């Protein structure tokens, strides 16, 4: 094949053959030709000398694809090897690229026809600039500006280069350059911006060329967020921009520039200019888009440019208000313009576009939070009274600060009232609502959660809660007014009722209790009434879903009103017979949610009742659940289990449990009775399904009853183990006789489902039961043979991973009391599971995760058992841990790393410290650096850092009393372990990262030692190293900052807990006292 000769780079490459190879890959080739071309092109890219051919290729090809290929090779060299190249080679390449750019952009025809090529050359030039400027190319900016003045097309391209440069340095630099380099480039751009500024103003005042003006506005946009402020406010720049705003061709670019200026925030120094800018802007906007315009309709029928204008307008207003609303509200002559701007923004918020709405919603959320905080935090009795729902303010209570807060609230009262209307009209769907309208207008059960909608609901809910706190009465009035219009039919529509009820449910907990009670009595009464008077299955399903959602959000109200609670629960039982998709599921979910928060109410005799509700419910149990699917019945059993769990009298509790389990127990007894006559009976698929269903019902009840499930599980436990053993043997026989495909048959799958559910039931019970040793003694010994022995005997495909998680739960629960059993557990599961999971990274994913969870439980609570392992066994454990954290599946890698940390800490404190670390220290360090610098393992960053910190602190901890190195293989002794580890690490990293200099590696390792006792400094050192080593370049590096983000989330949760309603009553784990 002619293309093979391309591999010989000792002479100039044959550009014709290269063109044909590139064309075969991108355009003309068959599947085989494309694969062969791909391989050759990859090999050429990987060849370190290929870049020397780039100029030759660019000069001799007319193929754009070939040019791009050559520039791709060059880009790799610039990114990773530029500083290592000889000066003359660097300068030669730099000059060549600059000349080609000037040549192609100096005349209109070539600039337009070669636009894509010029753009790519610009990117290459900027990559070079990032390395060489300012130190090695001091004249770069003056050269660029001088070139721009020679022709309008060159000037247009120079603007494109300047834009790219700003974006590269300021927008895309995190994770690609060290903090020091970014700082240096920013300072250089700042100091030389005068030339760029003059060039931009000159073009905007003198040029008539549309493309050039657009390129200039676009470049300016990239610089406005960070340049010295004098260039904006002490020159004619703002006036010039505002002059371009009314011109349709420049409107969108200009408003983007004005938005950047609006988003600057640096104190009060330029307030006058901001007020002037806003005043002129609103004046021009009223002509372009008159206030009477129906913006949502205009948007839906507008062109792409017009829609972009509305989007940009939203960004401008939200940015300006975010930083300068205080200036506008404190300047009396522009207050009316501020309100006009807010009116525009509210109208834009009704636009049917998710992105536009997100922009508006984020701002509304921050504005109402700010108004609420001022109102919440001023230590003013009037304000506090208002927060408790005591309105209006009492005369004489308002001091100076309170007065300001009140005036501000007064100023915004009208826009805030309109904003409440917006939030109620556009409220997003909460997670609990399962009934939705599909694209054909049918009411169906939701099949997939939409995460974007859930995020939007969370922000809207929070916003509406702040709005409710600012004026409870207006919130209540607007909601009841809209509900009346639903009843009268004036505004009846599924969507209107949905958004209204979602809004009502979302403000739960934000009103004072007496106001909430009054409000809800009306809401629930009206919704139940609406359900009665409305005809049509779909309509009823929509109303039912809304009733269920609203009542599920207000447990405090239900606990205080037994009659309403009983009515609501009976209504849910009614809905459990309604077969419309989603209604039964939602009824069962809502029932569970209500019972969890009101359980005590169901086990006491209420006024006017003859017996507790739970007893009445158990009498009619069979009728209530007769139309439910098995999974819904399981949910129902969990709910009733919650009620029974609230009964404090043990005798009554056992009686209720007996009545609850009567139906499944009766069926179980029949099946076991038949099996005693003939074991074949248990092989019938209908029987197997019934057994599975009975076990699932038991698991559901055990989930909510915990310890109190003891009498029930004791009743079925031994029979259940016998069924388990028998089904297990059946599975093994089928797989042994039928080969690997047997495990895919429905019969084997069904048998295994029973085995898994048995294990899940035992695990659920032991996990939920209070820590009572006698329970462990009763249940664990019988399982040693039935479950563990069975696992060991089975063929790999028949082993249940749940065995591993069950024993992990048992060890986590009973801790050191399990010490004597660990050798048996090891014997049964260790070797045979390792053989299953160490052949590759894919097979048996469930076994992997659960195996390492079991090992972690043993390492944490039964560590002495690990010390007793033989050296080969311990080596297997350590190899398996390394195997785990090398895994790209996040859960497995994290479990492995957590387990490793437990091992490191425990061995450090044990008598085997020297022996363990001499065997494994270097291997662990090497493996951790390997995953740390692999971008697939970014999520493990926090744990990688903790392991390295543990290793670097060890040599000086006093735990080691012998050298880590092997004296027989190391030619000279080190003064101490610290010196050895330092040198070993430097050697390890130098050989792994040849692109880093010895000085850089040594500096990094010294930094690790200096910061080893400072977790934050240690972590930052490693972050900088990852950037410097080029392992984590232009990618999303948020995983490296995950810990900081988690701390921020916890602070936010604490803040939310302090504001009534912000965390929904259902989400607060407070065991809601409801006696």
Curated annotation (Swiss-Prot):
Disruption phenotype: Gametophyte defective when both XPO1A and XPO1B are disrupted. Abnormal pollen germination and tube growth, impaired female gametophyte development and embryo lethal. Impaired ability to withstand moderate heat stress (37 degrees Celsius). Enhanced sensitivity to methyl viologen (MV)-induced oxidative stress.
Topology in membrane: Peripheral membrane protein
Coiled coil: none
Main localization, broad class: nucleus
Compartments in which it is found: Nucleus, Nuclear pore complex; Nucleus membrane
Domain of life from the UniProt record: Eukaryota
Function summary: Receptor for the leucine-rich nuclear export signal (NES). Binds cooperatively to the NES on its target protein and to the small GTPase Ran in its active GTP-bound form. Required for the maternal-to-embryonic transition and during gametophyte development. Involved in heat-induced oxidative stress basal resistance.
Protein name: Protein EXPORTIN 1A
Native organism: Arabidopsis thaliana
